[in-house]
């Protein structure tokens, strides 16, 4: 089965969705994962197509002309005092553009409250035939794989999923074998990248790397292959923000190199796995 790839918006954050789509098409991606929910972070553009009819039209035009599709949208955060209904316009726009999923993360330490609101988000997304895929983030309130699993089990929604980001997984000191016991139906896509093996002790430094210095696959110290080998076949979203490389190469070339390195790494890892299985069988 052909491996499909999506271009995550954080990789090319300065590009509006139409430009992102054209870049993805030229590089050879199958999908885009746009950030249609504005988070209000310093220096981060607002790409809310639900509130910008012209941007929505231009995005539709780009998708139609290139054949690239929307895989998932970002980022429905569960914050203190969040009203999940505030995400309805983005969910509707996502469905209109053919998306399959909405990515979510939890930033409130109030676990029971977070579970309740995550469940409400899942219920809202269900009417648009969207899954809600939770990621553990090392600087958020749900940090580890165990944290995310706890939320999913207690929320108990049939359209809830678990999104593994290889950077976050490594930073949380999670073990790949822990993925074996989890329901396969939870896994819809993964975000993949590499990064330095050393885990920053400082939150600010971890955030800086997370948002602006991730590495091409095979370039850093994360055993990405060990993580992917525990997951079912799925779309890989390439979230590889690197501010210095973007300044040097431009968004288009950086996105292309992200995909080329991922394809090479995944292909080489698949060959190694076949050799290992053959050796064990012999």
Feature-to-residue mapping (PLM):
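Active-site beta-loop-alpha junctions enriched in small/polar residues
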Residues: 8-12, 35-39, 75-78, 106-109, ...
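Alpha-helix N-cap and loop-to-helix initiation/capping positions
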Residues: 16, 47-55, 82-89, 109-116, ...
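A short acidic, helix-capping loop that chelates divalent metal ions and anchors anionic groups
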Residues: 40-46, 79, 172, 244-248
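Short coil/turn segments at secondary-structure junctions
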Residues: 43, 102-105, 135, 211, ...
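Active-site acidic/histidine proton-transfer and metal-coordination neighborhood
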Residues: 62-69, 75-162, 171, 269-276
